[in-house]
């Protein structure tokens, strides 16, 4: 199986949802639902409303993503 190319985009957290899900507005204006990656969860990095984050999207479903980095 070939690993697909993931799309990385920057966005701002708009809302916190249950089960460590977040509503994120991307730079291009789209709003997606994103969950936290395992490394962020393992290191107890806190993500709050208004934080700038880097989101990874798959080409298969552009409405869901994974938060892989929180900017300072």
Swiss-Prot record:
Superkingdom of this protein's organism: Bacteria
Q: Where in the cell is it found?
A: Cytoplasm
InterPro entries (alphabetical) = NA-bd_OB-fold, RNA-binding_domain_S1_IF1, S1_domain, TIF_IF1
Has the keyword ATP-binding been applied to this entry?
Answer: no
List the GO terms this entry assigns under cellular component, sorted alphabetically: cytosol
Tell me, what does this protein do in biology?
A: One of the essential components for the initiation of protein synthesis. Stabilizes the binding of IF-2 and IF-3 on the 30S subunit to which N-formylmethionyl-tRNA(fMet) subsequently binds. Helps modulate mRNA selection, yielding the 30S pre-initiation complex (PIC). Upon addition of the 50S ribosomal subunit IF-1, IF-2 and IF-3 are released leaving the mature 70S translation initiation complex.
| Organism the protein comes from | Blochmanniella floridana
The record's note on quaternary structure and interaction partners says: Component of the 30S ribosomal translation pre-initiation complex which assembles on the 30S ribosome in the order IF-2 and IF-3, IF-1 and N-formylmethionyl-tRNA(fMet); mRNA recruitment can occur at any time during PIC assembly.
Q: Which GO terms describe its molecular function?
A: ribosome binding; rRNA binding; translation initiation factor activity
Family indicated by similarity: Belongs to the IF-1 family.
Q: Which UniProt keywords apply?
A: Cytoplasm, Initiation factor, Protein biosynthesis, RNA-binding, rRNA-binding
Q: List the disulfide bonds.
A: none
NCBIfam families the UniProt entry points to: infA
Which Gene3D superfamilies does the entry mention? Nucleic acid-binding proteins
Q: What is this protein called?
A: Translation initiation factor IF-1
Residue ranges of every copy of the S1-like domain listed in the record: 1-72
């Amino acid at each position: 199986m070939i690993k697909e190319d993931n799309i990385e985009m920057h966005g701002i957290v708009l809302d916190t949802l249950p089960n460590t899900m977040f509503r994120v507005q991307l730079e291009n204006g789209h709003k997606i639902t994103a969950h936290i990656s395992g490394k962020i969860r393992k290191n107890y990095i806190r993500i709050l409303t208004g934080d700038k984050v880097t989101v990874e999207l798959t080409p298969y479903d552009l409405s869901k993503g994974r938060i892989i980095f929180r900017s300072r």
